[in-house]
Amino acid sequence: MPRDKSENHEKIVEAAYEEFMTYGFNEASMRRIASNCQMSASGLYKHFSSKEDMFASLVEPAYQGLKEKYNKILDEEYKDIKNKSAEDIWEGDEETVWVTKYIYDNYNAFKLLVCKSQGTAYENFIHELASMEEMATIEYIEKLKENGIKTNPIPKKELHLFVTSNINAIFETVVHDFSKKEAIAYAKRLDEYCVAGWKRIFGLSE
């Protein structure tokens, strides 16, 4: 993480973002970033210990924030299960919408994560999110059963594929450079599509 908060720091952050966006992590050059900031490479290392450290500083706050918000909303959903019938499950949650709004409020960070993170500790972030969602879905279904709501069994391998495709679909708006307005409109339709599908395969709809 950044070591120095001098007046040059913002200039370095901007140059680093442009470098990673242009060349990707693997081909990005600390020397080129330093040159674009009109400073020496050794001067750059006073701010960041490595290229990995620099990339992490650009994406980690937004990525961590997404996971924290997800867990908070998940806790609220668990608490609300007792007040729902089978027909109400997942209705009106608009999970994809709030995720999309968060992504676009932190667009630069997620553009790097989605498109330029190969070679970093974040290159499998979608798999990590899918694993979180998979475990959360399994726990959610168990809580439904505890509250007397029956569901159809789904093989764990299939569930993993369904969840992964769902997560990938959310981030496709970043890949294809949707505007925030376009992305939110798409997210609303994706929510409707996914909720209908989940309810169908879990036997929560007629």
Language model: regions and residue ranges:
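Short, basic, alpha-helical segments at the C-terminal edge of helix-turn-helix-like DNA-binding modules
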Residues: 30, 60-67, 74
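Amphipathic alpha-helical packing segments from all-alpha helical-bundle domains
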Residues: 95-105, 120-146, 157-164
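Helix-turn-helix
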Residues: 11, 15, 19-53, 57
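Hydrophobic/aromatic-rich alpha-helical bundle segments in the mid-to-C-terminal region
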Residues: 141-194, 202-206
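Secondary-structure edge/capping motif, primarily at the C-terminal ends of alpha-helices
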Residues: 73, 77-81, 110-117, 144, ...
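Alpha-helical DNA-contacting segments of helix-turn-helix folds
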Residues: 56-62, 125
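C-terminal/domain-terminus segments
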Residues: 17, 113-130, 182-198
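Hydrophobic alpha-helical connector segments
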Residues: 57, 71-102
